[in-house]
């Protein structure tokens, strides 16, 4: 609510050395939304199999802590003595983690290094080369078969399920920026089908190293500015961020029976795979699928990436559905949490769901960090959409209509129709609604 910007200068693991350019000679971010000390866990709450070393996938313990915190907030106990009929769905797929990198260093990278040394020193005795290899191995974290498996996707999800005493399906998936929506969609399906009575859905973007940032910079327009203002008139690119979120889901009847605190209802989720579909088509699909008039949505937690062409698509989509504003007509508030924490990549839609759910629960329209010069299409009286520069009470004109919010997300390929045709999912919408029992 304080419109705080949490972007900070890159740390030593992400910054470029002075005087160097990134691999693609493209703009490289100078700031990022970083987890810092938040990337932590409470060891006593988790069954560590051994002492953790630098060669293990420590993302796992952070994700498990997030899952624990979500369960506790929902009134459930991690390490329940009786198995829970529950499922775990996680959006998580960094190109590498500490575990996989350590194994590459012990194998392929070590072989390449020794090959280079042999080429530069062809007359070196084999005993000396063996000693060099031994010293290189000693400088690395000790390899461990269990830690290697925990660096893979299937063990990642099953570990969390075991720690939470969930006896059902546990999967890790990668839908890019839409991973949060995909995880939530699968979790809802688990509940509807009866496969689970409780579902954990989450998405995670762990600390981003330089190698990952350099790779992303080849395809994503990054901004070199120190702040990100979604829907500003002049945009040059996005600023990355780290983060994660987990949600505990139940069928509404079960949640009310158990007297749970309900932050929001998931009314509909739509993920578009057709390159011809623009955000308005996906938003219409999401609202029509749950028989919700689109103009009853009062808040759009937008993608708002800072990429000009992507933001223009979102604005056009909203104007296409809401039309030109007329006196007494419905208005829809727009904002994006990316101005506060950056673009958290696979966790971006999960971050949007957190913000929108809390907005519904507290009946407050939350502000975003306001741009000095808002986009012309939003800063005029003819627009049915407006940017939230200040927090305001969420007042509805119709006492019989519940408050509703839509969370939008788009993969970076959404602005490239040719490339998008070969990819699985371009944009997504999650429609949330306040719980009527809370409202009354």
Predicted regions: what they are:
Residues 1-440:
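Condensing-enzyme catalytic core of the thiolase-fold
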């Amino acid at each position: 609510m304080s419109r705080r910007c949490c972007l900070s200068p890159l740390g030593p693991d992400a910054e470029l050395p002075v005087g160097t350019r990134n691999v693609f000679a493209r703009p490289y971010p100078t700031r990022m939304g970083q987890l810092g000390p938040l990337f932590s866990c409470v060891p006593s709450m988790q069954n560590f199999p051994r002492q953790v070393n630098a060669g293990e996938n420590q993302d796992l313990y952070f994700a498990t802590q997030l899952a624990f915190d979500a369960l506790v907030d929902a009134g459930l106990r991690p390490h329940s003595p009786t198995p829970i009929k529950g499922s775990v769905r996680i959006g998580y797929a960094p190109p590498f983690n500490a575990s996989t990198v350590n194994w590459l260093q012990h194998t392929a990278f070590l072989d390449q290094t020794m090959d280079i040394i042999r080429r530069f020193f062809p007359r070196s005795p084999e005993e000396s080369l063996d000693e060099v290899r031994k010293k290189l191995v000693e400088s690395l974290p000790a390899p461990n078969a269990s830690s290697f498996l925990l660096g893979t996707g299937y063990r990642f999800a099953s570990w969390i399920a075991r720690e939470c005493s969930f006896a059902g399906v546990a999967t890790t998936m990668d839908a890019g920026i839409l991973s949060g929506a995909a995880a939530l969609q699968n979790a809802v399906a688990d509940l509807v089908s009866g496969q689970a009575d409780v579902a954990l859905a989450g998405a995670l973007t762990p600390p981003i190293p330089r190698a990952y940032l350099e790779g992303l910079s080849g395809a994503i327009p990054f901004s070199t500015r120190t702040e990100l203002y979604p829907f500003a008139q002049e945009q040059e690119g996005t600023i990355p961020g780290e983060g994660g979120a987990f949600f505990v889901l139940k069928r509404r009847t079960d949640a009310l029976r158990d007297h749970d605190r309900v932050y929001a209802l998931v009314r509909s989720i739509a993920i578009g795979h057709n390159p011809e579909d623009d955000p308005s088509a996906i938003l219409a699909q999401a609202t029509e699928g749950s028989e919700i008039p689109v103009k009853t949505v009062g808040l759009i937690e937008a993608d708002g990436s800072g990429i000009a062409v992507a933001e223009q698509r979102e604005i056009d989509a909203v104007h296409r559905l809401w039309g030109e504003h007329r006196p007494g007509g419905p208005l829809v508030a727009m904002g994006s949490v990316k101005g506060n924490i950056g673009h958290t990549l696979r966790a971006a839609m999960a971050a949007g769901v957190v913000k929108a759910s809390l907005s519904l629960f507290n009946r407050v329209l939350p502000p975003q960090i306001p741009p000095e010069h808002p986009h012309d299409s939003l800063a005029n009286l003819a627009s049915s959409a407006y940017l939230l520069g200040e927090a305001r009470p969420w007042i509805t004109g119709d006492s019989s209509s519940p408050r509703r919010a839509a969370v939008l997300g788009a993969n970076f390929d959404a602005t490239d129709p040719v490339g998008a045709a070969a990819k699985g999912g371009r944009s997504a919408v999650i429609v949330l609604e306040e719980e009527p029992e809370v409202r009354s």
